[in-house]
Amino acid sequence: MANHAAKPLALTLGEPAGIGPDITIAGWLRRRELNLPAFYLLGDEALIARRAKTLDKTLGKALGAEIRIASVSAHEAAAAFTEALPVVATGERATAEPGQPDASSAPAALASIRQAVADVRAGRAGAVVTNPIAKSVLYRAGFRHPGHTEFLAELAAKDGRVPQPVMMLWSPRLAVVPVTIHVSLRDALSQLTSELIVSTVRIVATELKSRFGIARPRIAVSGLNPHAGEDGSLGHEEQTIIAPALKTLRNDGIDARGPLPADTMFHEAARSSYDCAVCMYHDQALIPIKTVAFDDAVNVTLGLPFIRTSPDHGTAFDIAGTGKANPASLIAALELASRMAAAKT
C-alpha cells in the first residue's frame, strides 16, 4: 500500500483469550507480501510468545515462515518490524488461554488501549488500531463504557471536555455511520434529535475531507421509519427531526441528501451516488455493510483528536488459537489507519 504513515501504528492487545493475538501474528507474517505499514503490539510478551508457539504449527507452517517476537520500546518498533513482531510491554500480565476468557486479564486489555492513546498523543505512534474486546468480560472487571468508541472518547478528553465520537464502518464498497450507537432500539429513538444528526454529519463531512481526501463529500441520510415515513403516514420523525437537520446542514454547504428510505439505499447503483450513508440507529447501518463487506470492513472512530481504526468483528473465542482466524479486516484496518495518518491535514 502506498503512502504509509511516517510513524508506526499502535495496535492494542484486545481480549487476550480471543483472536486478537492470532490475527496480529497472521498479519505480521504477511507484512512483506502485502507491504504492510509498520505496527507494534501493546501487551504481554509472554502471552504473545505462547500464542505464537501454538500458531507456529498452523500459520507458520502454512506460510513457510518463522514467527519471531521482539520486546521493544515504541521508538524501536519500526526498525524491528521487518524481522520480528514488535511487542511493547504495558506492565500488565495476561494469563487467559485461547477461547477461555478470564476477567483477571481485563486490566491487560484496558492498559493496552490506554497506552496506545498515550503513544499516539505523545507522537510515538501515527494512529491507534484496536483488536476486538469482549465487553462482557470487561464488565465483570468493572468496565462501565458501552464500548470501545465511548472509552476512547473519554481518553481523548481535554480540559474535562469529551469529544463526540462518531462510529464509521468503512469498506471500498460502502461507508456507513449510525447516529445513535450502542444503545437499545428504544433508547435510540428517544436519543435521536436534529442537533445530534447535525453534529454527526458535520463531523463526517469534515473528516471525509481531511482524512479521506474527498473534496466535496456526498452524504446520504436515511429516514427512520419504513419508506422514510411515507409523508407522515408511517411516522413523523422524518418531518420533525431529520428534515430540519438536513436543512441546517445544507445551509452550511454540506451535500446531505435525504431523508431516504433505508430499504433502497444500499443496492449497488444507489451506493455509487454517495460517499457515506448516515443512518439513524446501529443495525440500520451495520446490517448492510456486514452484508456487502463482511471480511474487510473497518471500524473507524471519527471526531477524536487522533486516528483510530479496528477490524469489524468480534473476539471469535471458538477459533482462538486454531490458526483459522481471517486477518483480512485487521489488515484493512492497518492499511486504512496508515493512509489516514499519511493524509491527515
UniProtKB/Swiss-Prot annotation:
**Which prosthetic group or cofactor does it need?**
Zn(2+); Mg(2+); Co(2+)
Provide GO CC annotations from the record.
cytoplasm
Q: How is the cofactor bound?
A: Binds 1 divalent metal cation per subunit. Can use ions such as Zn(2+), Mg(2+) or Co(2+).
Q: Where in the cell is it found?
A: Cytoplasm
Q: Name one GO biological process term.
A: pyridoxine biosynthetic process
Q: Which reaction does it catalyse?
A: 4-(phosphooxy)-L-threonine + NAD(+) = 3-amino-2-oxopropyl phosphate + CO2 + NADH
**Molecular functions (GO terms):** 4-hydroxythreonine-4-phosphate dehydrogenase activity; cobalt ion binding; magnesium ion binding; NAD binding; zinc ion binding
Its annotated function is as follows: Catalyzes the NAD(P)-dependent oxidation of 4-(phosphooxy)-L-threonine (HTP) into 2-amino-3-oxo-4-(phosphooxy)butyric acid which spontaneously decarboxylates to form 3-amino-2-oxopropyl phosphate (AHAP).
What does the sequence similarity comment in the record state about its family? Belongs to the PdxA family.
Entry protein name: 4-hydroxythreonine-4-phosphate dehydrogenase
Q: What gene, per UniProt, encodes this protein?
A: pdxA
